């Protein structure tokens, strides 16, 4: 058996829904202080040790070190477990009132009970969310997970019924400047952190909602500049600017990256790399290793 490194930006990531239907929660999700507080309130070391046996690496949802675009500050942004700093950020928003159980209260008086939607397909997600639930309780936030079928899950997110959801991180964690940075800007409804803004772009302003955040508007502009760019240097600068904005604004909350994928190889199967990248985009999993060149060694067998 071989252990190949996955190329996801984060094995599991949280997606605050900036287009949530609930006005109070939508306002919070669009406040960078709230997103940063949630990120600081996650004990990633605990998650890595308990769920991934210490084999992963604590990280935001960003590109991996194998990419020439990687910068250490992207990985480290708002990832240090710091309950004091997280609580200070929540206080600065004005969320200072608490109920008898110690839960913070929303401006309308409701307790801060944050429901995270899942597709119900992964016990790994459930285990990670249980650990996050414990650390967020120290922030005065009660977190609950709501599993459902994938189709229902997506409809809830796209319609704004979901406050937050969980999925894997960036699908391409090892990009080059010539690969599309579309995952970093609202370009499709499929993006769980801003489905209505993505739909607006995807449907050429005929559906969804126009982005209101200046940084998000800049991301869309940068993506268009990348599409029209004829210079490799310019494309690299655009990529780095988009990565910087995403790291600072914490539109998605990464947890652990560099998780390992077991690859079972028959003893007499030859030409399979001992070390590899397990990734759909780029790579098509085994595709980039040319499986047509794998062969079975039958020497000495009858």
Label every PLM stretch briefly.
Residues 4-17, 37-78, 84-88, 124-134, ...:
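Detector for C-terminal structural segments
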């Amino acid at each position: 058996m071989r252990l190949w490194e996955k190329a996801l930006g984060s094995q599991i990531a949280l997606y605050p829904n900036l287009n949530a239907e609930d006005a109070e929660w939508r306002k919070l999700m669009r406040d960078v202080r709230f997103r940063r507080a949630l990120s600081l309130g996650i004990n990633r070391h605990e998650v890595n040790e308990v769920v991934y046996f210490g084999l992963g690496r604590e990280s935001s949802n960003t590109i991996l070190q194998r990419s020439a675009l990687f910068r250490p500050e992207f990985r480290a942004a708002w990832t240090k477990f710091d309950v004091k700093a997280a609580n200070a950020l929540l206080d600065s928003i004005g969320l200072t009132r608490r109920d008898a159980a110690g839960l913070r209260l929303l401006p309308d008086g409701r307790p801060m009970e944050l429901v995270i939607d899942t597709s119900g397909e992964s016990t790994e997600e459930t285990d990670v969310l249980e650990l996050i639930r414990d650390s967020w309780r120290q922030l005065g936030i009660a977190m609950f997970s709501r599993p459902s079928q994938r189709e229902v899950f997506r409809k809830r997110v796209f319609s704004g019924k979901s406050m937050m959801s969980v999925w894997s991180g960036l699908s391409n964690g090892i990009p080059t400047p010539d690969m599309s940075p579309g995952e970093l800007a609202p370009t499709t409804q499929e993006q769980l952190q801003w489905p209505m803004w993505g739909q607006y772009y995807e449907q050429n302003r005929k559906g969804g909602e126009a982005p209101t955040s200046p940084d998000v508007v800049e991301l869309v502009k940068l993506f268009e500049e990348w599409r029209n760019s004829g210079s490799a240097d310019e494309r690299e600068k655009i990529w780095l600017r988009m990565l910087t904005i995403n790291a600072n604004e914490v539109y998605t909350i990464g947890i652990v990256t560099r998780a390992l994928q077991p690859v079972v190889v028959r003893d007499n199967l030859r030409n399979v790399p001992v070390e590899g990248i397990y990734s759909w985009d780029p790579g098509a999993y085994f595709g980039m290793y040319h499986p047509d060149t794998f062969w079975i060694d039958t020497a000495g067998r009858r």
